[in-house]
Amino acid sequence: IDSTGIKVEGEGEWHASKHGGPKRPSPRFLEPVAKPWLDWRKIHLGIDEQTLEVRAVEVTSSDIGDAPMLPELLAQIPTDQNIASVTADGAYDTRKCHHAIAERGAHAVIPPRKNAKPWKAITAGAVARNEALRASKLLGRALWRRWSGYHRRSRVETKMHCVKLLGQRL
């Protein structure tokens, strides 16, 4: 599961917004109302790691976060189809995401946030997340990523890049 920005007009603003740098032209050249640098959408994808097939997709406005979309993406995959694991970045380290993944009987491969604290173990998602937190602290983040299979996420990032290239040309 991941998301990326798709520019509706122009280039580079998503990267500048996401990673810093100049986001817009000098204010003296702008009309007070026009904000063309904000004109982009987010595409949220659920991709099968083995086949690289896009299994779920949602397009939202730029103000929608990543984590709230995970349950909706999982809901697009038929319940009779097994999901072995869900790999996502730290933005998805939320109770709702872990709960949605556990409800589907899948294993969450989400790195705990750097300032993460254990959750009360009242749901299967919380128990699994606490185990990931414990393993991450025990092994260290780099070794945890290797041990958990998080490193395989790069295959999905490659597919995401392909989708982004296509989207910017539509």
What are these regions (language model features)?
Residues 1-114, 118-120, 125, 164:
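Polybasic low-complexity intrinsically disordered regions
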